[in-house]
C-alpha cells in the first residue's frame, strides 16, 4: 500500500474544517481508550482538560503535540489520521508499534482552540513561554517532556 492509499483508508472523517476543539476530539479519544491509553495530564487556564494518548512499546520514544496555537488545527487532523494508521493492525502499524512508543497531546491549548486564537486564555503565546513556564499548558508540556524523555519531538 502506498502513502496515498493509506491516507484514503485511514483519514479521520469525523474532524474537518479549521475549527477543531475538545468537543470534536473527545469522542475520538473515548473510542481510543480501550486499553487506558488516554488520560488527562493537566488543565488549561480555563480548567479545560489536556489529554494525552499513548501507544506502542518500542524503544524509540516519540513525543507529538498539536494546537499549541489554538487556531492551528491541521496537525490535529493529521495526528488522528496517524493514530488511525497505528490502530489499523496492519503489518506496517505492528512494525511501528514494536519500534516506537508514541506519546501524543492532541490539543495542548484547548482555550485557544475554543477562542480560535494562537494564544491561550491569558493572551500568552505558548511557543514563547517554553523557557519561562508561566502558563499551565507550558508546564504540562515541559513535565511530559522531562518524564517521557523522547528521542524525537514533533509539534
Per-region residue spans from a language model:
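Active-site-proximal beta-strand/loop segments in catalytic clefts of secreted hydrolases
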Residues: 43, 66, 106-109
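Short, solvent-exposed polar/charged micro-motifs at secondary-structure junctions
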Residues: 48-52, 113-114
Amino acid at each position: 500500500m502506498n502513502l496515498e492509499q493509506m491516507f484514503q483508508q485511514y483519514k479521520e472523517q469525523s474532524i474537518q474544517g479549521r475549527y477543531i476543539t475538545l468537543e470534536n476530539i473527545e469522542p475520538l479519544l473515548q473510542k481510543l481508550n480501550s486499553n487506558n491509553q488516554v488520560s488527562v495530564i493537566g488543565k488549561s487556564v480555563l480548567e479545560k482538560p489536556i489529554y494525552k494518548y499513548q501507544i506502542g512499546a518500542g524503544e524509540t520514544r516519540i513525543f507529538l503535540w498539536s494546537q499549541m496555537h489554538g487556531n492551528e488545527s491541521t496537525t490535529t487532523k493529521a495526528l488522528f489520521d496517524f493514530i488511525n494508521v497505528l490502530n489499523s493492525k496492519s503489518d506496517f502499524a505492528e512494525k511501528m508499534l514494536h519500534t516506537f512508543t508514541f506519546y501524543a497531546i492532541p490539543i495542548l491549548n484547548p482555550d485557544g482552540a475554543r477562542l480560535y486564537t494562537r494564544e491561550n486564555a491569558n493572551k500568552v503565546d505558548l511557543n514563547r513561554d517554553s523557557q519561562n513556564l508561566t502558563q499551565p499548558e507550558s508546564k504540562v508540556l515541559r513535565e511530559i517532556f522531562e518524564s517521557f524523555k523522547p528521542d524525537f519531538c514533533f509539534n
